[in-house]
């Protein structure tokens, strides 16, 4: 998901997406440990998406404090 798409979402929607991505990341790591994961790059994508979303939430918090 691109940063521009994330910025169009509300903070509550972003937090919900973070929660679902964390669940997906947990499942991906579990699959990796059991040898069932084929697309290992997906773990990196999910981690980056979570980081992007957290960054945008933090930007909003800092902008609100100004």
UniProtKB/Swiss-Prot annotation:
Q: Which residues form a coiled coil?
A: none
Which keywords accompany this UniProt record? Answer: Ribonucleoprotein, Ribosomal protein
Tell me if Ribonucleoprotein is a UniProt keyword of this record.
Answer: yes
Extract the Gene3D superfamilies matched here.
Answer: 1.10.287.310
Q: Which domain of life is it from?
A: Bacteria
InterPro entries, alphabetized: Ribosomal_protein_uL29, Ribosomal_uL29, Ribosomal_uL29_CS, Ribosomal_uL29_sf
Example GO biological process term? translation
**Annotated family:** Belongs to the universal ribosomal protein uL29 family.
Q: Name one GO molecular function term.
A: structural constituent of ribosome
**Organism this protein belongs to:** Geobacillus thermodenitrificans (strain NG80-2)
Q: What range does the record give for the signal peptide?
A: none
The gene that this protein is the product of is rpmC
What Pfam families does UniProt report for this protein, alphabetically?
Ribosomal_L29
Q: Which cysteines are joined by disulfide bonds?
A: none
Q: What is this protein called?
A: Large ribosomal subunit protein uL29
Would I find Ribosomal protein among this entry's keywords?
yes
